[in-house]
Amino acid sequence: MDRRNGGDPLAPPRPPKLLPRVHRPRAPEPTLSGVDHNAGATASALASGASSAAPVAIHNNNSQQQLSISAAASNNNTISIIPASPDFDDYQIHHLTFLPQRPSSLSRNSSTASSTTATGISVSGSGSVSGSSSSFTRRRPPAPVPLNNSISNNNNNSINNNFLSHFQSAEPASNALGQPPASPVTLAQPRPESERLTNEYVDTPLQHATRSQHPAGQQDNGQTTTHHLLLLPQRNQHLHLQQHQQHLQQQQQQQQQQQQQQHLQHQQNQQHARLATTTQATSVGSDHTDGLLHSHLQNSTTKPPASKQPAPPRLGMGLGLGLGLGLNQPIITKQPTPATQKERMHALEELLQPGGAGGNGGPLVMAGDPSLLNPIVCPRCGRCRCEQCQSPRPLPQTWVCNKTCLCSAESVIDYASCLCCAKALFYHCARDNDLDCDDGNGTPCVDNPCSCGPYKRTQRWGWLGALSIFLPCLWFYWPMRGCMKLCEKCYGRFAGRGCRCQGIGGGGAGSGGGVGSIGSTSSMLPIVPLGVNGSGLGGGVSLSGGVTDGGLNQANGKAMDHGCSAARSILRKGDLTPEKRLLDSSPDY
């Protein structure tokens, strides 16, 4: 059975394909003529050179490629053939495993190298035999040995035989004659481990090592095959990859836990920063800086926990422009996360609650966007603060008589007070240009003869006085209009959709100033400059009574005027709806 890697049926299996492919020329086909010739030459040399004739038995085993010569003499000497010159390889094989190397004298190609192989044996007088041989084996031979070696004694012979016995295998004599083995070697029935040779593709510097000395052979009592040894790097690499993957998984889990902790900490910091932005109060220095000023009745303000440092307040809408407020503030590089309206106004409601330690506390300068301080939805009642919702709702009206007559409060007053007759008289007696003149409110004077507009005011009121003599019900027109306004006010109080939060109970004006009453943020009055005395703030703002007592010392008039105008503009913008803010910021309006 030819395995196509040397022509020997006992050749080892091919190594796995993961090894680097090395070009190896094929060895010549084995012949039996060289063996017979070498055996005859050896026998003739021994017979002619020995002083005392002794029968010599030569056993040649071609299948195992070894030459064992035993002499039946009284001195028990053993003749060993040692190569004179080592064979060098023309290439270098990569070292994959540590395997013992078979000496070149045991090569299967040493006996069948070529027809030009010459074996010379010379027998010395002392009984030592030395020889030289050359072969074309592709295996790296052992280190060169000196030519003149004495014949070893029985101890050396036993050591050499034990070393060579590792590579020998007992085979029947039929294999020595070139006959095929009894049981063919197939893929289904592989060759026994005892009949296998070492892999000639593997080279190693360790010459006298056995398989049991290999790290893999220590686990299976030296029964590890060459194929298993070649797979050791793969096993080690697989274990290394598993350890690396486990290490990466642990690192990923640690990173995920750290990210979750950082995310929770970031959310907590944002919540504390929003509260601090709403509630933080900054004292007014000697440069008379002011902003959105709301005098409060409490001395203490809500503080965030001591472990978390509050974020610095954000300057919105140009607050404190040119007054030195933004010199020590860090640059804002990230937009804050929007919060609910109740969270934004939570701290403001605590400040506006009645009660406290008196009205001598310093004014509270609120920093930030005015829209956050004046939200469109009231944090108390949850209703809208826009002008349309806060304006009183008109009395209901409807169309009756198949939608031909409008039933409303004004129409009822017109018919009840006979004002409809006066309107009809003015309409028929008026000129064309009188229909285009209005009373200043966009309503023509013909439709509203009782208006106070400047157009023909004397004539209209004179004719109404003359008609009241014939129509005395005209005298009830103004009382009925007053009753209608009272009904509208009552209806708007109970049916209004907007915020109707009233002002907080006021505190009297003191030496430090105070607030009389503060209504909803939609009805704030413009802020007047702060009063400054020698000890600091000497005046406050009272929305009901004006500026409280306290000397107004304008040491820096320009800064005060500029700050006051900036505060007024911010207050006006904070009171507007988003649509009106857009119109206010447009240069066309």
From Swiss-Prot:
Disruption phenotype: Pupal lethal. Mutant embryos and larvae show ectopic tracheal branching. Residues 1-37, 102-194, 239-320 are annotated as: Disordered. Its main location: membrane. It comes from the Eukaryota. Interacts with DRK and RasGAP1 proteins of the Ras pathway. This is Protein sprouty. It is a peripheral membrane protein. Inhibitor of tracheal branching that restricts branch budding by antagonizing the BNL-FGF pathway (BNL: branchless, an fgf inducer of branching). Acts as an antagonist of EGFR-mediated signaling in the eye (where it is important for cell determination) midline glia, chordotonal organs, wing and ovarian follicle cells. Induction: By the BNL-FGF pathway in the tracheal system and by the egf receptor pathway in the wing imaginal disk and the follicle cells of the ovary. InterPro entries: Sprouty, Sprouty_domain. In ovary, expressed from stage 7 of oogenesis in the posterior follicle cells and during stage 9 when the follicle cells migrate posteriorly over the oocyte nucleus, expression is seen in the dorsal and lateral cells and is excluded from the ventral cells. Once the migration of follicle cells is complete expressed in the dorsal-anterior corner of the egg chamber. Expressed in the embryonic tracheal system, developing eye imaginal disk, embryonic chordotonal organ precursors, midline glia and wing imaginal disk. It is found in: Cell membrane. Residues 104-135, 148-162, 239-272 have a biased composition (Low complexity). Keywords: Cell membrane, Developmental protein, Membrane. Residues 163-172, 276-286 have a biased composition (Polar residues). PROSITE patterns: SPR. Belongs to the sprouty family. GO terms for cellular component: apical part of cell; cytoplasmic side of plasma membrane; cytosol; plasma membrane. PANTHER family: PROTEIN SPROUTY, SPROUTY. GO terms for biological process: animal organ development; branching involved in open tracheal system development; compound eye morphogenesis; dorsal/ventral axis specification, ovarian follicular epithelium; glial cell development; lamellocyte differentiation; muscle cell development; negative regulation of epidermal growth factor receptor signaling pathway.
